[in-house]
Amino acid sequence: MSKRDYYEVLGVARGASDEELKKAYRRCAMKYHPDRNPGDAAAEATFKECKEAYEVLSDGNKRRAYDAHGHAAFEHGMGGGGGGPGGPDMGDIFGDIFGNIFGGGAAGPRAARRGADVGYVLELDLEEAVAGIERRIEIPTLIECEPCHGSGSEDGKVEVCATCHGRGQVRIQRGIFAMQQSCPHCDGRGTLIQNPCKTCHGAGRVEEDKVLSIKVPAGVDTGDRIRLAGEGEAGPAGTPPGDLYVEVRVREHAIFQRDGDDLHCEVPIRISQAALGDTVRVATLGGEAEIRIPAETQTGKLFRLRGKGVRSVRSRSEGDLYCRVVVETPVNLTADQRELLKQFEATFTGEDARKHSPKSATFIDGVKGFWDRMTS
């Protein structure tokens, strides 16, 4: 059966960047890795296909050769031993899946592999995000199997793989290139289990809901992430666990809108307060504060209350609270109130009205000028 195009295997365009290739490989590895699909031969075959594609496309020289000649670039002189003469040694370029993606460095299966990182979205009210909180969460994850202590073996015995001699990797020759890849006999583990654990079926890990207590620092905002080292999935065959990344999302607030460390809100005032001036009380996250409204205040005027915003989670400086005044039209008026407003309105005549309502006069003049230009 002919091989599929490597770009098709990873689901990327031929011009994909290194980062796009890495992300595509990560998605494939997380979905089809044998540790996640024990006993599934089809998933294992797909995983190996993705790994082979990534090993070629992630290396500049091999990618150029593949782009020029396709699979034919690697079909001659294949062997199972060490690198042939004259060919560049690609020895340690390719680690195990978790070494490549998550930063493993040392050779060998136990050094290169680790558990997968886990993500969790934590929703908070604004007050909780501003003040900080300790929250208990429950996450589904893979933990080390207790009966076999993560070894995957019922009796605790494992055998060193005779093919790779425990390294988990073998070197093969493909055309002019020598490269290193996971051992197909032990799937990169370096060991073989003859008597699999009855609890985890040889995986060394079992699914379980883990309960954790998270201390959320004061001042966090949507998009901030909290890393809990070692609280991700247990690593295969007793290797180190991954990390847990908690992403914060702050719910919308009924009064305040957040912009970084600053807060914004609207403060409704009556027409009489706007015209005559007044002192109004406004809510802040720390209690109430006063704003002095000067006479003849218009809708949209901003008042700044310094230090009444959010204390920064990074610099510990405090943001400000910006209060936008909105002059509210009165409703549910009594007959007497309506009559008073009519009498008040009657006092605005001719040029006097323009003097008391400068924005209205400017608007009317603008409309008149527009129509004059349109009809001239």
Curated annotation (Swiss-Prot):
The gene is dnaJ. GO terms for cellular component: cytoplasm. HAMAP family: DnaJ. Binds 2 Zn(2+) ions per monomer. Belongs to the DnaJ family. Residues 5-70 form the J domain. It comes from Xanthomonas campestris pv. campestris (strain B100). The J domain is necessary and sufficient to stimulate DnaK ATPase activity. Zinc center 1 plays an important role in the autonomous, DnaK-independent chaperone activity of DnaJ. Zinc center 2 is essential for interaction with DnaK and for DnaJ activity. Its cofactor is Zn(2+). Keywords: Chaperone, Cytoplasm, DNA replication, Metal-binding, Repeat, Stress response, Zinc, Zinc-finger. This is Chaperone protein DnaJ.
